[in-house]
């Protein structure tokens, strides 16, 4: 009982108790009458969006005035599309304010797919299936994964650098590209993990000419997409398809298959965006053709470096000895697939294209 009394006395003397006493003794503050003028501020009230078979998706919200997506978005604040802007807000200074500079009709659906098909390299990849490989094969796998991780890092930088330059009026694109940046981070992670899990390590840095071309694109997001998708993205996608066929274990097969799934979304967005940009800008078709012609020189410099070519041939042939015959045959088949698909995409975009002399050996024969 004595202890309880002492504890109560101590509580009464505590700083908190003193604060409560002072607040109780202070005069009552006058609470202003709420004006509630904001309650009648809405561009369209009474909207009821019903979830469809896939739930309440991002695209399903585009109803009424909330589905109005103009070709130009002059508002340079962070005001959500459909909301009433506040007067006097300082501009943020977005560089990309035209729909033709960023838009792709598939962006909302790609966002939904991206958030539904997430995978975790730490726990989803069956790492226990990775077994010791012959030294030459392990070195080749590590070298290829080193260069693929470098490609992924470039994607992170490029996507993040341009995404924050886009106005909020085209939020579907901003939201999808947020997932694409996260995909690239996951790819960077998983390729490094494959290089480091099996007694090997990271290999040699790639020549990086195409990397710099993508990173230093300053003409706009569309220019960056030309290099990110039509050049680097398609090549990476083609390499991954062949790597999945020649995977040494289930872990590698899982990695390449799931990265391909993520990559397909970026390719879809990029091609849709280029199609939209060309349709709404009379000069864009020739601009894309010029950009590709400029990029050919840098692509060939990377192509002439033997490191990636030899590493892929070893994987396809199963060894250094196998690389000299079957491995190089598969590599050449892979390059033919890349050039063929590249030309098909250019034809779909109505972009005139000439295969550079160095790569004509892989071009389809008429």
Locations of regions flagged by a protein language model:
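Terminal targeting/low-complexity segments that flank the catalytic cores of oxidoreductases
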Residues: 2-174, 197, 201, 222-223, ...
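Short amphipathic alpha-helical segments with heptad-repeat character
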Residues: 146-149, 153, 178-181, 185, ...
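Amphipathic, well-ordered alpha-helical segments in soluble domains
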Residues: 151-159, 187, 232-239, 266
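Long, hydrophobic, well-ordered secondary-structure blocks that form the structural core
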Residues: 156-217
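A structural feature that tracks compact, well-ordered secondary-structure segments
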Residues: 158-163, 178-179, 237-243, 257, ...
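Active-site-proximal alpha-helical scaffolds that flank and shape metal-associated catalytic sites
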Residues: 193-267, 293-297
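C-terminal helix-coil-helix/basic helical segment that borders enzyme active sites and/or dimer interfaces
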Residues: 274-282
């Amino acid at each position: 009982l004595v202890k309880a009394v002492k504890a109560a006395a101590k509580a009464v003397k505590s700083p908190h108790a003193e604060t409560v006493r002072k607040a109780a003794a202070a005069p009552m503050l006058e609470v202003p009458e709420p004006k509630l003028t904001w309650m009648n501020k809405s561009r369209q009230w009474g909207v009821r969006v019903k979830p469809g078979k896939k739930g309440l998706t991002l695209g399903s919200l585009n109803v009424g005035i909330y589905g109005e997506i103009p070709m130009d978005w002059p508002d340079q604040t962070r005001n959500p599309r459909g909301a009433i802007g506040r007067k006097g807000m300082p501009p943020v200074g977005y560089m990309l304010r035209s729909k033709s500079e960023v838009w792709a009709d598939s962006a909302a659906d790609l966002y939904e797919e991206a958030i539904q098909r997430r995978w975790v390299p730490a726990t989803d990849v069956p790492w226990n299936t990775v077994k010791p490989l012959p030294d030459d094969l392990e070195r080749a796998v590590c070298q290829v994964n080193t260069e693929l991780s470098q490609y992924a890092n470039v994607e992170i930088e490029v996507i993040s650098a341009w995404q924050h330059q886009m106005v909020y009026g085209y939020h579907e694109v901003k939201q999808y590209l947020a997932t694409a940046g996260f995909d690239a981070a996951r790819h960077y992670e998983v390729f490094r993990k494959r290089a480091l899990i099996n007694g090997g390590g990271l290999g040699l840095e790639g020549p990086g000419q195409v990397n710099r071309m993508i990173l230093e694109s300053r003409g706009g997001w569309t220019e960056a997409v030309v290099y990110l998708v039509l050049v680097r993205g398609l090549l990476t996608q083609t390499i991954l398809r062949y790597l999945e066929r020649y995977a040494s274990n289930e872990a590698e097969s899982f990695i390449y298959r799931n990265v391909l799934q993520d990559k397909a979304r970026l390719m879809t967005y990029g091609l849709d965006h280029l199609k939209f940009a060309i349709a709404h800008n009379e000069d864009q078709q020739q601009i894309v053709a010029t950009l590709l012609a400029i990029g050919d020189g840098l692509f060939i410099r990377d192509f002439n470096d033997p490191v990636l070519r030899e590493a892929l041939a070893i994987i396809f042939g199963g060894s250094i000895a196998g690389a000299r015959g079957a491995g190089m045959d598969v590599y050449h088949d892979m390059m033919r697939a890349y050039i063929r698909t590249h030309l098909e995409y250019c034809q779909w975009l109505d972009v005139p294209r000439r295969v550079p002399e160095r790569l004509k050996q892989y071009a389809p024969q008429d």
